[in-house]
């Protein structure tokens, strides 16, 4: 799918109330109540990642309730998950379990504080889809945009 079609599909899903088909999707049922993102966010990202040239970076993957639906049945050129799970003991194992359960194995996992990674680590990749779900302070939100 080209970028304009993927974006159009994602925006349509985000605006419409018609998410019933996706509500019964086993993937969404599996994460119901376990993550902090809503179903529309998950569908929006999933539609964006249907773009055949998608290069996705998600910071703050926690249990995978956003990351896994984003990648589900998609084949992005690049996919990176960044989390150090410093505020969530035991969640890394749950994230990896969810990835295995849903057959996701084509992604890169960086287990570090995002702000402690060098932007040069990512400079060779031109990410075109970026979801930051790390620390939620206003300052962190700005830092997340500037860090890349």
Regions found by a protein language model. Give the residues of each.
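A short alpha-helical cap/connector motif
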Residues: 1-148
């Amino acid at each position: 799918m080209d970028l304009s079609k993927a974006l159009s599909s994602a925006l349509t899903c985000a605006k419409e109330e018609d998410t019933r088909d996706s509500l019964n999707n086993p993937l969404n049922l599996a994460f119901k109540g376990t993550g902090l993102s809503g179903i529309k966010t998950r569908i929006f990202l999933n539609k964006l990642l249907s773009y055949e040239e998608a290069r996705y970076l998600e910071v703050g993957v926690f249990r995978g309730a956003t990351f896994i639906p984003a990648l589900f049945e998609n084949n992005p050129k690049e996919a990176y998950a960044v989390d150090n799970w410093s505020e969530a003991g035991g969640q890394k194992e749950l994230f990896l379990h969810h990835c295995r359960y849903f057959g996701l194995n084509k992604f890169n996992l960086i287990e570090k504080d995002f702000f402690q990674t060098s932007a040069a680590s990512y400079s060779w990749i031109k990410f075109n889809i970026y979801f930051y779900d790390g620390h939620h302070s206003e300052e962190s939100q700005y830092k997340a945009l500037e860090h890349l």
